């Protein structure tokens, strides 16, 4: 399997914040699109506009770290419109980098098979 780093973020859009959520999402998507090692950054919303899932994939751990380096600025924006429920990591990370995600709402899934064609 490739050394891509993949995770999903799940959360609830704050009551009455959907329009603001869309503006924040657009800002964060624009930022992520400019990152060289960001391969995939897709946001999906439930039909009732209450839940958001974000699928993120990076070229490697360095690219993922570069993306998260902006959390100091982008994190407060995101958290102003979303209550984060869960982060699921689908990659084998270094112990040091895994600590970035450590917490009660984090789940680590160990890759055991499959393939990526891109």
What kind of feature is each model-predicted range?
Residues 1-52, 59-70, 80-118:
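Short S/T/G/P-rich N-terminal loop/turn motif that feeds into the first structured element of a domain
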């Amino acid at each position: 399997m490739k050394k891509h780093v993949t995770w999903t973020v799940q959360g609830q859009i704050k009551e009455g914040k959907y329009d603001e959520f869309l503006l924040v999402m657009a800002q964060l998507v624009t930022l992520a699109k400019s990152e060289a090692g960001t391969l995939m950054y897709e946001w999906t919303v439930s039909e009732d506009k209450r839940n958001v899932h974000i699928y993120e994939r990076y070229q490697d751990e360095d690219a993922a770290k570069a993306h998260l380096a902006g959390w100091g600025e982008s994190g407060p924006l995101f958290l102003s419109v979303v209550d984060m429920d869960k982060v699921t990591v689908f990659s084998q990370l270094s112990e040091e980098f895994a600590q970035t995600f450590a917490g009660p709402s984090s789940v680590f899934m160990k890759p055991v098979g499959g393939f990526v064609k891109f």
